[in-house]
């Protein structure tokens, strides 16, 4: 919804091939083929990327796609990523309906959660913070943009937090905001490594979690 299929595929290629986005287009054909062969040897599974125009697709479109993939390709995903919730459409409210943003975003969240239950797969998406949340190093549910109906509907929410100190050591902080499946105070905060050039996230040592966990 936000990015072209090709741009998303490039990011995934950079991650899998362990090359930077900048170097991806300059890879010699032989090296490219070698990396592809290595990936095929060491991994399994299928990934399907589908692009929709911004604010035009809703849960019924995603449901139709899942059914089409099941019939034509015998494919059922293990997880569905939607980029991102706030620029989806609602199947209950038309774009020009006289409805406020609270109800509209809440409706989208409810429809996607319903689809997840129906298809028996997790659906992961993203949202943004309010203007004050952008400069807040301790983001909370109240910093969710547009509609508090979104965190009221979600089963699991976490915030990704960055600042100059974390950027200097190539890390981002993760804070659990809501968790219906476990105690959200367990591992409430932790850091993970990030390599933005290769679109990668990775674990960091326990020694780097000091003072963050459950604080």
Predicted features by range, described:
Residues 2, 49, 83, 112, ...:
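Conserved RecA-like P-loop NTPase ATPase core
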Residues 3, 125-128:
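Conserved H-loop
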Residues 22-28, 50-56, 90-106, 133-142:
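Flexible beta-alpha connector loops of hexameric P-loop NTPases
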Residues 40-41, 60-77, 94-96, 114-119, ...:
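C-terminal regions of RecA-like/P-loop NTPase motor modules
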Residues 48-50, 124, 158:
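Hydrophobic/aromatic beta-strand patches that form the interior of the parallel beta-sheet core
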Residues 76-123:
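Helical hairpin unit composed of two closely spaced alpha helices linked by a short loop
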Residues 81, 126, 153:
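Generic enzyme active-site microenvironment
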């Amino acid at each position: 919804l936000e990015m072209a299929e090709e741009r998303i595929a490039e990011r995934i290629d950079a991650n899998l091939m362990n090359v930077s986005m900048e170097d991806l287009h300059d890879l010699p054909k032989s090296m490219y083929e070698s990396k592809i062969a290595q990936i095929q040897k060491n991994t399994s599974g299928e990934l399907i990327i589908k692009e929709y125009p911004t604010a035009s697709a809703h849960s019924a479109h995603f449901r139709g796609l899942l059914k089409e993939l099941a019939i034509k390709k015998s494919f059922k995903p293990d997880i569905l990523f939607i980029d991102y919730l706030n620029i989806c459409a609602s199947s209950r409210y038309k774009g020009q309906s006289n409805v406020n943003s609270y109800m509209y975003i809440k409706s989208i969240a409810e429809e996607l959660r319903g689809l997840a239950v129906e298809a028996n797969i997790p659906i992961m998406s993203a949202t943004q913070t309010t203007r004050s949340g952008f400069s807040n190093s301790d983001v909370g549910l109240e910093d969710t943009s547009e509609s508090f109906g979104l965190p009221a509907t979600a089963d699991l929410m976490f915030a990704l937090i960055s600042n100059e100190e974390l950027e200097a050591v190539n890390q981002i902080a993760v804070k659990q905001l809501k968790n219906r499946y476990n105690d959200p105070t367990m591992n409430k905060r932790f850091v993970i490594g990030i390599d933005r050039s290769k679109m990668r996230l990775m674990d960091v040592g326990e020694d780097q979690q000091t003072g963050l966990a459950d604080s």
